[in-house]
Amino acid sequence: MTDPIADYLTRLRNAIGAKHRVVEVPASNLKKEITKILFEKGYILNYKFVEDGPQGTIKVALKYDSVNKVNAIKKLERVSSPGMRKYTGYKDMPRVINGLGIAIISTSKGVMTNKEAAELKIGGEVLCYVY
């Protein structure tokens, strides 16, 4: 697999489209950090790291509105890819839907949202947009 982050986002999108409650994805440190950010920002209900085998898996519980059965995540968009990396400085930090969504940035201080990176005045690689 050439792009594990794109695979992770696609698995989440497919599970949302099929109205699954839980999706299980192969684990990596970067995926764990992205999942933690999605949980902290309220886009997913819960997550659990399961160590089964050399790599392990992440079980992600998706968050749905109780009335309309609409998912909290409207769109997951991969920005930087292995073939075409996209970097940004803190002054040019992307605003996703005028601040309603988040951009997940991989920086020298770890993986964080665009707002956190701008506050710390550090740039990095734009991994994806979530809204």
Curated annotation (Swiss-Prot):
<dbReference type="InterPro" id="IPR047863">
    <property type="entry name" value="Ribosomal_uS8_CS"/>
</dbReference>
<comment type="similarity">
    <text>Belongs to the universal ribosomal protein uS8 family.</text>
</comment>
<dbReference type="InterPro" id="IPR000630">
    <property type="entry name" value="Ribosomal_uS8"/>
</dbReference>
<comment type="subunit">
    <text>Part of the 30S ribosomal subunit. Contacts proteins S5 and S12.</text>
</comment>
<keyword id="KW-0689">Ribosomal protein</keyword>
<keyword id="KW-0694">RNA-binding</keyword>
<keyword id="KW-0699">rRNA-binding</keyword>
<dbReference type="Pfam" id="PF00410">
    <property type="entry name" value="Ribosomal_S8"/>
</dbReference>
<keyword id="KW-0687">Ribonucleoprotein</keyword>
<dbReference type="GO" id="GO:0006412">
    <property type="term" value="P:translation"/>
</dbReference>
<comment type="function">
    <text>One of the primary rRNA binding proteins, it binds directly to 16S rRNA central domain where it helps coordinate assembly of the platform of the 30S subunit.</text>
</comment>
<dbReference type="InterPro" id="IPR035987">
    <property type="entry name" value="Ribosomal_uS8_sf"/>
</dbReference>
<dbReference type="GO" id="GO:0003735">
    <property type="term" value="F:structural constituent of ribosome"/>
</dbReference>
<protein>
    <recommendedName>
        <fullName>Small ribosomal subunit protein uS8</fullName>
    </recommendedName>
</protein>
<dbReference type="GO" id="GO:0022627">
    <property type="term" value="C:cytosolic small ribosomal subunit"/>
</dbReference>
<dbReference type="GO" id="GO:0019843">
    <property type="term" value="F:rRNA binding"/>
</dbReference>
